[in-house]
């Protein structure tokens, strides 16, 4: 698999012990599916499939009459399948929107509506962060854990790339202990 300007160019096959290693368009590494392309991209099809399987399993057992219980269980079991390792990825806007739409589908099923404003209000009053907001929280916590790491190698590597966390705080105008509350305050107005 290749990433960069020449990702479409044909390469000489790599051989190890007379076995040819084939180039592929997509690969799985540590549970994350990475696609070849001009820039590094991720494939969330498997993550969405696992999310839907978990959410549908929960709904089949609990039903849609108790959405608070369904959402609590989905937050514990289905959302981690969808957001696995996203805190370490630099996702573009379309990838974040794809993840948001996946959860929006769950709300459509639970509340029997397709109206975006109704879904936004349901998310707000059920205290359910969108995946894109959840990724912001997870990324911020990930950066904080790198800063506070006792491993000196991690600290050195992170200090080389520490622009990310200051840019991150400036981009979202967030920081400190009230990160979720700051994101929560603007949830309805971003729809």
Task: For the regions a language model picked out, list residue spans one by one.
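Short, conserved micro-motifs composed of acidic
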Residues: 1-26
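Basic, alpha-helical interaction scaffolds
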Residues: 18-90
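Active-site-proximal structural scaffolding
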Residues: 71, 99-100, 135
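Short amphipathic alpha-helical coiled-coil/interface segments
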Residues: 98-107, 139-142
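Alpha-helical bundle/repeat cores within regulatory domains of eukaryotic proteins
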Residues: 119-125
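Extended C-terminal regions of large enzymes
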Residues: 125-191
